[in-house]
Amino acid sequence: MEMMPQYDLSRLPENTALKQQTLPTQQLNLSASVVLSIFFITGGFCLSIGIILLLSAKSTKKIEINYTKTCANCAQLRENSSNFDKACNCSLPFYLPEKMEGDVYMYYKLYGFYQNLYQYILSRSNSQLVGKDIWDTTNCDPFQVSHNDTPIIPCGAIANSIFNDTITLSYNLNSSTQIEVPMLKSGLTWWTDKYVKFRNPRSSNFTSTFAGSSKPLHWAKPIYELDLDDPGNNGFLNEDFIVWMRTAAFPTFKKLYRRLKRVHAFAEGLPAGNYSLSISYNFPVTMFQGEKSIVLSTLTWIGGGGLFLGLTYTVTGALTLLASFAILTIHLMLKRSKLNFL
């Protein structure tokens, strides 16, 4: 007589739909009309958004002044690193054809400067930048210590190569009267950078705190003297320094330098007319065949006048609509051939 196997009933799964894997399911049945509707709606939406973004970007007013060749004498001087402490100034007049209404932003723009190199990005000390351990130079090769073996603060390749041109914008009221355009050096950074990623050490005397350290090789003054007039913009919290430390993804990039202070003759923006840029030329670009320029620009609700986002939406929408018409054509041809067969 054959023995029946014995089962431990306590180990059997509960008799529920979930445990027995008998939950009801629903399979989405996509018909040709549903697929075509999705494609047409998606394509129309992306194309509409793209056109809106492009029109908005086109509405920004912008002027770019390249001063690489205009300041050629200074550029030649800066090719020799031993001349880093020698002053060199140049002036660049230009004409603004249209009034720039509202908030106006000044950027510096670099061509051919690769901030996205892996070794360059890693060459920094986050412990220094948050004020936790200003003597930590572990990851700052090859700019860890100076020639006399004292730690560099701030260390690393990014800090060492900071953009250090000084730019002043002036407005020519007439042939004999020139006034300096008031600019703000605050409100240039991201909130997270200013209040999270960069902090000064807890000290009331930066001179004693940073005693025994060296400034980066090509800096004119140490980190604690970047802005003696504004303690909130000094040290690691200096906004020009913070803006530079946020590395760019592409070799051609622009970074915010100043904001227009809307007072007096500039309360409504920058009036059309003759201007001039006075530049203290310090940042070398000719040695790597680069260029640099100043950009004055207004903003819209989507930001600057970049066309990338608008073009992306427009191209995506156009391709989706083309695919929609192709699918529709194939569907009608197959439907007609099926009717002819019957």
From Swiss-Prot:
Coiled coil: none annotated. Residues 55-306 are extracellular. The keyword Glycoprotein applies. The chain crosses the membrane at residues 34-54, 307-327. It is a multi-pass membrane protein. Specifically expressed in testis. InterPro entries: CDC50/LEM3_fam. Keywords: Glycoprotein, Membrane, Transmembrane, Transmembrane helix. GO terms for cellular component: membrane. It is found in: Membrane. Glycans are attached at residues 66, 80, 89, 205. The keyword Iron-sulfur does not apply. Residues 1-33, 328-342 are cytoplasmic. Belongs to the CDC50/LEM3 family. This is Cell cycle control protein 50C.
